[in-house]
Amino acid sequence: MTYSLNSWIKETEKKTKIKLDSYYISFVYLGIIMRLQMKKTVIFDLDGTLADIDIRRDKSLKPNGKLDWDIFAAPNSIMDWDTPNEPVIKMAQMFAKEGFKIVIFSGRNDRGFVATNHWLTKHNVPFDLLVLRPDKFKANSWPIADGNPATDEMRFMPDEILKKKMLDTFVDIDDVFLVVDDRDKVVKMWRDLGLNTFQVAPGDF
């Protein structure tokens, strides 16, 4: 909603029945404008950032050393083997307490959408929006009917391209205060967009 200064003065005086002096008006109105202009969204990655997935990755390896994606992406694997990255979760909690919108963008397959929600709740991770790689549950993991709908190619799309699409679809880039991620290629993409990005760990993969 957009207010002119005069309309704001009239509405406030009507509600409070107090005649506002010019100094008070200038101070309060400036505060309102500054708050409206503040960037209020923080984007978090999930695997390797909010969640430590080392155990799940190790237990999902085949004898030849390659990852068994069926085991790795299984909901019970997420719930049983992922551990919380407490410092990063604490960061999310602090931002949420200050009124920031917490958005989680992950390249994790949406077969684990329900389990991921349960895991986040179990470990007290605050979030306003969770977006996963769309596959089987697009209505939940990519909740948009038009504009930038989920497509089949997103199933195997590189994370840095997928997350750019997530940004374009779900968040106003001008509202992003900070991004927290771990993968080098994704961090580079965020920074190339001019977004302040905190890299929680080396991620050359």
Model-inferred region functions:
Residues I102, F127, F177, T197-F198:
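Hydrophobic anchor at the start of a short beta-strand
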Residues Y3-W8, T12-L46, D54-R57:
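Non-catalytic pre-domain segments flanking phosphatase-related domains
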Residues D110-F177, V186:
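Substrate-recognition "cap/lid" segment bordering the active-site pocket of phosphatases
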Residues P84-V88, E160-K163, R183:
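Amphipathic coiled-coil/heptad-repeat helices and related helical stalk/stem segments
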Residues L167, L178-F205:
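Acidic, Mg2+-coordinating phosphoryl-transfer loop and its flanking beta/alpha structural elements
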Residues L36-K138:
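Alpha-helical substrate-recognition element adjacent to the catalytic core
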